[in-house]
């Protein structure tokens, strides 16, 4: 595996499987949790390389940080970044293979 493909493989952390994300799949939109430093062109290249599909749009969002307590001290969890990837007409990604 070349260095550029290894970098692209590290961009996508995991697919997001929620009720809302599952409903978006019917509109050819897939939600992934990505590295906080990932840019839209990098996310587009990673999805196209890993899944062999054409991406028409990438929307990103950062979730709000959540407060966590340990004893008396208060800390915060980091803000995860998500990407909503829209695929071209006729393309799809199989997240749940039939077994």
Curated annotation (Swiss-Prot):
One of its GO terms (cellular component) is ribosome. SUPFAM superfamilies: Ribosomal proteins S24e, L23 and L15e. Keywords: Ribonucleoprotein, Ribosomal protein, RNA-binding, rRNA-binding. Pfam families: Ribosomal_L23. Signal peptide: none annotated. InterPro entries: Nucleotide-bd_a/b_plait_sf, Ribosomal_uL23-like, Ribosomal_uL23/eL15/eS24_sf, Ribosomal_uL23_CS. The keyword Ribonucleoprotein applies. One of its GO terms (biological process) is translation. One of its GO terms (molecular function) is rRNA binding. The keyword RNA-binding applies. PANTHER family: 60S RIBOSOMAL PROTEIN L23A. One of the early assembly proteins it binds 23S rRNA. One of the proteins that surrounds the polypeptide exit tunnel on the outside of the ribosome. Forms the main docking site for trigger factor binding to the ribosome. Part of the 50S ribosomal subunit. Contacts protein L29, and trigger factor when it is bound to the ribosome. NCBIfam families: PRK05738.2-4, PRK05738.3-4. Belongs to the universal ribosomal protein uL23 family. This is Large ribosomal subunit protein uL23.
């Amino acid at each position: 595996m070349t260095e550029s493909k290894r970098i692209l493989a590290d961009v996508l952390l995991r697919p997001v499987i929620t009720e809302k994300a599952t409903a978006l799949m019917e509109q050819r939109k897939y939600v992934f949790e990505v590295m906080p430093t990932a840019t839209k062109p990098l996310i587009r290249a990673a999805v196209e390389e890993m899944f062999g599909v054409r991406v028409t749009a990438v929307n990103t969002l950062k979730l709000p940080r959540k407060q966590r307590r340990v004893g008396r001290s208060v800390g915060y969890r980091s803000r995860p970044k998500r990407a909503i990837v829209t695929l071209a007409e006729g393309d799809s990604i199989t997240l749940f293979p039939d077994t």
